[in-house]
Curated annotation (Swiss-Prot):
Single GO term (MF): RNA binding
Function: May regulate mRNA translation and stability. It binds to poly(A) and poly(U) regions of RNA. This binding is inhibited when the protein is phosphorylated.
Top-rank taxon: Eukaryota
Residue positions where Phosphoserine is found in the record: S173
Name by which UniProt lists this protein: Heterogeneous nuclear ribonucleoprotein A/B
Keyword Secreted: no
InterPro entries: Nucleotide-bd_a/b_plait_sf (IPR012677), RBD_domain_sf (IPR035979)
Composition bias, Basic and acidic residues: 12-23
Keyword Ribonucleoprotein listed: yes
Chain positions with Asymmetric dimethylarginine modification: R119, R122
Domain RRM: 32-48
Amino acid sequence: EEVADGQAHGEXVYREEHHEGEKNXHLVXKDEETKLFVGALSWETTEKYGEIEGINVKPNLNRXRXFAXINIKTPNALDDAIKYGTITXAAVVLDKXKXYEVDIKKATPKDAMMMPPMRGGRGGLGLGGAWVAPGSFGYGGGYGGYGGGYGDDAYGGAGYDYYGSGYGGGYGSGYEGYGYNGGYGGYSGPARGGK
């Protein structure tokens, strides 16, 4: 049975469920093989490495969220996107072209990560955390079944905990999901949650 999870501004994401309400295990496995997490993302980025099935972003915010979870049609296309590293050519307004650095990682559901729960720095909880800011969206709320999701002003959340830290300290002070320290600096707006 197909169920539409509606969000503000007409956003809807579809998921399949068994009649008992359990998620289709085949879809979860495919999702893990074809989902990318892209950080430091500009709205003007248009480079494409493979056919995209869906992009999950929060719409109409009057500011860049700087990250998105992207479903690519085939695992090979996902591998190609990762293989090219973190630099991609982006078409920007006024037809100018420039090199733009983004952070491309394979998305990993939190229950597939073997690390114990920890705080992720400013902006909420890190891996395994459960804090979600008011008005947040994410897997389990709108995107169907991966926990609480991204916090409103933080990467940390209960769903795909890619970075586990918030916007507030720059582009992230944790990177717990990938073993990085430090971050890019960049967006420094307000963060809510842990200190």
